[in-house]
Regions:
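Short, well-ordered beta-to-alpha junction loops that form the rim of enzyme active sites
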Residues: 8, 36-39, 128-130
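C-terminal catalytic/acceptor-binding lobe
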Residues: 84, 90-198
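Generic detection of intrinsically disordered/low-complexity segments and helix-coil linkers/edges
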Residues: 6, 61-63, 169
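Conserved catalytic core of nucleotide-sugar-dependent glycosyltransferases
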Residues: 14-101
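Hydrophobic/aromatic beta-strand patches that form the interior of the parallel beta-sheet core
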Residues: 4, 32-34, 126
């Protein structure tokens, strides 16, 4: 089996097939996982606020990239993340049993502690040529990692977004169709539309 991790600010920008990703993972046993947030387009590391070098890619299938995360930098060197990646349960389930968590930050922090055990056995990571997901960090909704970098735009506070929703407005997700972000995390303006009456 496989497991897909997602967080509440993850946005999909293009169609993808989980069934295809499962097959690719099965055919690339040296890969730890498949990142939906990485690609040749992710040339900037938002969390560190700097450009990131691209790893040396190979292409095991059409539109798919493979790289050695143990020889990479920044986002490309961070293989265990919970924002938008798919992993095999065989590798992840034993870790999940050992991690004490009650939110995504604690889960990711707990998983990262075990990354060293995969350096020899699973040094590769897979992704699409162009990422199909990114996180839009418009606000901070948790209190355990207050140093997480987020937008300072006051119109996207939790209270402001809740007020818009209560007034019948929702985020227009079509606005993000085919967006090609330069980073795994990228602040983007939100577009709103009136919620359809049911």
């Amino acid at each position: 089996g496989k497991i897909l991790f997602l967080v509440d600010d993850a946005i999909f920008t293009a169609d993808f097939s989980i069934a295809d990703i499962e097959k690719i993972l099965d055919n690339n046993r040296d890969a730890l996982g498949f990142s939906l947030r990485l690609g040749k387009n992710t040339q900037y590391c938002y969390m560190m606020d700097r450009k990131q070098p691209q790893p040396e890619f190979t292409s095991p299938a059409d539109g798919i990239l493979k790289f050695n995360w143990t020889k990479s930098e920044l986002d490309f060197a961070y293989p265990l993340e919970v924002s938008s990646s798919i992993y095999r349960l065989a590798e992840l389930f034993p870790l999940l049993l050992r991690v004490n968590f009650n939110n995504p930050n604690y889960l990711e922090g707990g998983l990262v502690r075990f990354v060293g055990q995969f350096v020899a056995s699973h040094p590769m990571l897979l992704c699409y040529d162009t990422s199909v997901a990114f996180c839009n960090p418009v606000n901070l909704v948790q209190t355990v990692s207050l140093n997480n970098r987020v937008s300072s735009n006051k119109k996207y506070t939790v209270d402001e977004l809740a007020a818009l929703f209560d007034s019948g407005w929702v985020i227009n997700t079509r606005f993000f169709d085919h967006v090609i972000p330069e980073s795994c995390h990228q602040e983007m303006e939100l577009s709103f539309e009136k919620r359809e009456a049911k």
